[in-house]
């Protein structure tokens, strides 16, 4: 308590949960933003340049060196914020959900980089919702509940606790599947990571189909990542055919997208000749940071106008409609809730949208209270949204769009900062809206959530659609997933590496 902030910041680096709150806004390029802290410390110019280049390479953001940080995607901004702290080389680094907006490959890179720092002697303290990564990389985990310490132990000890769900924590996917099959280590704990689970491979049940294939195939081709049987080859053929047109035939189309192109900066394409039809199945859009996902849904909402191509909603050209005209039809929840929230009370925030599409004050309040109840925040109706945590502000933003009762709901990274309870709430909302016949489209980096909640998956990379199909079709294509810097869901990956032929997405199946 006696140490000044100026003295402490030279020893302890803090990466905020929300990168928008960390970037200074005083610098016009990524390079200058990362160097900003070093300038304040008086680091010599040559050393400063060396450090900035080093962390940009480490976090794979060198290509954005001369871009304005606020022109980047949320995930790219998160890397820039992290780079600014890593460049200062503090003795202790505190990370508040540093990978919440990163694609799976980006998350792995950050965890690997942080692990390297930890092994070099730097103390790392991390708040995270990605328990599978924590199980793999953390030495100790502190379990908190309502501000009190419940336990401080190794990942396997923490995640093997029978009372874990009482504290709002769902064990990692690998632990859950080991619990289902009764696979335990000699010390009585369940494996918490993929490596630990595979070390006990012989304890898992073996599918008969896999046993026959194993005898026939021997040791050949086990790790090629290519489809290994006729069924998977047929799936690959079908999905490639779909990728030619980017369409899936399933009932009435809600959106028709034709030859869509967009760019923010001249000669820097963001979307390149995108062709899609979107029907009313729950649809997840996945892919690397900067793939053009958020840009695509903003175009669907009418917030941006394409430089060429057309978007039709219900047969009508969106270019002929204003944002106000689409507001009652298409709801959009921003990636960053702070870009959406502006009222001083939660209830007023959630009522704002309904009132602006023609509802009376009484109708708007009724819809707002219903929406707040759906997201579990009715008790916070009179609170200031800015006094809430990021996870709660995200739910407020979702409620404000739910209250408008639109036919289409677009969710940009709905699970950011959400714990197990929040994820479950959002998952139930998606299922309920789908049952009502509404169209739900979501951008996500959480592949397990995608597999559990969505029927259709669209994979994007570098402004193009790489794959478009059912989750079974898409998650069978390891080469496409790799191109898009995403991975199979954790449960799927474990079952695949155990040798199971079928793709499994939930424990129930």
Tell what function each PLM region has.
Residues 46-64, 362-380:
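Conserved ABC ATPase "signature" region
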Residues 68-72, 76, 384-388, 392:
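Conserved ABC ATPase signature
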Residues 134-136, 450-452:
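A short, surface-exposed alpha-helical micro-motif characterized by mixed small hydrophobic
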Residues 301:
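Helix-to-loop junction immediately C-terminal to a conserved catalytic motif
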Residues 1, 8, 309-317, 326:
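Conserved ABC transporter NBD signature motif
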Residues 146-147, 462-463:
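Conserved ABC ATPase "signature" C-loop
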Residues 93-96, 409-412:
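Catalytic Walker B motif of ABC-type/P-loop ATPase nucleotide-binding domains
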């Amino acid at each position: 308590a006696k140490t000044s902030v100026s003295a402490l910041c030279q020893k302890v680096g803090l990466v905020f949960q929300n990168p928008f709150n960390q970037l200074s806004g005083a610098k016009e390029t990524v390079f200058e933003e990362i160097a900003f802290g070093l300038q304040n410390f008086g680091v010599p110019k040559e050393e400063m340049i060396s450090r900035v280049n080093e962390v940009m390479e480490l976090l794979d953001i060198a290509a954005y060196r001369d871009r304005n940080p606020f022109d980047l995607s949320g995930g790219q901004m998160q890397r820039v914020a992290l780079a600014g702290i890593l460049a200062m080389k503090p003795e202790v680094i505190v990370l508040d959900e540093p990978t919440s907006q990163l694609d799976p490959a980006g998350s792995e890179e950050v965890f690997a980089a942080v692990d390297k720092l930890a092994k070099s002697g730097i103390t790392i303290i991390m708040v995270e919702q990605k328990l599978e990564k924590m199980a793999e990389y953390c030495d100790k985990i502190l379990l908190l509940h309502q501000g009190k310490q419940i336990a401080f132990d190794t990942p396997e000890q923490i995640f093997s606790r029978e009372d874990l769900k009482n504290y709002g924590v769902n064990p990692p996917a690998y632990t859950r599947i080991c619990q289902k099959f009764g696979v335990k280590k000699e010390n009585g704990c369940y494996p918490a990571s993929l490596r630990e689970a595979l070390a006990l491979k012989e304890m898992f049940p073996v599918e008969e189909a896999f046993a026959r294939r194993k005898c026939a195939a021997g040791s050949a081709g086990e790790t090629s990542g290519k489809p290994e049987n006729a069924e998977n080859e047929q799936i690959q053929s079908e999905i490639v055919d779909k990728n030619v047109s980017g369409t899936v035939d399933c009932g009435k189309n809600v959106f028709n997208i034709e030859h869509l192109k967009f760019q923010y900066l001249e000669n820097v394409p963001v979307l390149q000749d995108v062709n899609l039809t979107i029907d009313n199945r729950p649809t997840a859009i996945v892919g690397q940071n900067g793939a053009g996902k958020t840009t695509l849904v903003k175009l669907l909402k009418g917030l941006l106008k394409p430089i060429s191509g057309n978007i039709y909603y219900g047969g009508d050209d969106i270019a002929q409609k204003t944002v106000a005209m689409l507001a009652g039809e298409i709801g959009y929840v921003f990636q960053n809730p702070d870009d959406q929230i502006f009222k001083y009370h939660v209830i007023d925030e959630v009522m704002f949208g309904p009132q602006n599409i023609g509802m009376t004050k009484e109708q708007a309040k009724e819809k707002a209270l219903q929406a707040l109840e759906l997201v579990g925040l009715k008790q916070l109706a009179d609170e200031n949204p800015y006094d809430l945590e990021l996870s709660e502000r995200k739910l407020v933003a979702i409620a404000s769009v739910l209250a408008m009762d639109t036919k289409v709901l677009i969710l940009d990274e709905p699970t950011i900062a959400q714990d197990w309870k929040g994820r479950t709430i959002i998952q139930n909302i998606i299922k309920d809206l789908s049952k009502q016949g509404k169209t739900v489209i979501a951008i996500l980096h959480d592949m397990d959530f995608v597999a559990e909640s969505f029927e259709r998956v669209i994979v994007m990379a570098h402004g193009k659609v790489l794959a478009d199909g059912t989750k079974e079709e898409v998650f069978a294509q390891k080469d496409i997933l790799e191109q898009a810097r995403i991975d199979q869901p954790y449960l799927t990956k474990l079952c695949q590496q155990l040798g199971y032929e079928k793709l499994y997405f939930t424990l129930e199946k």
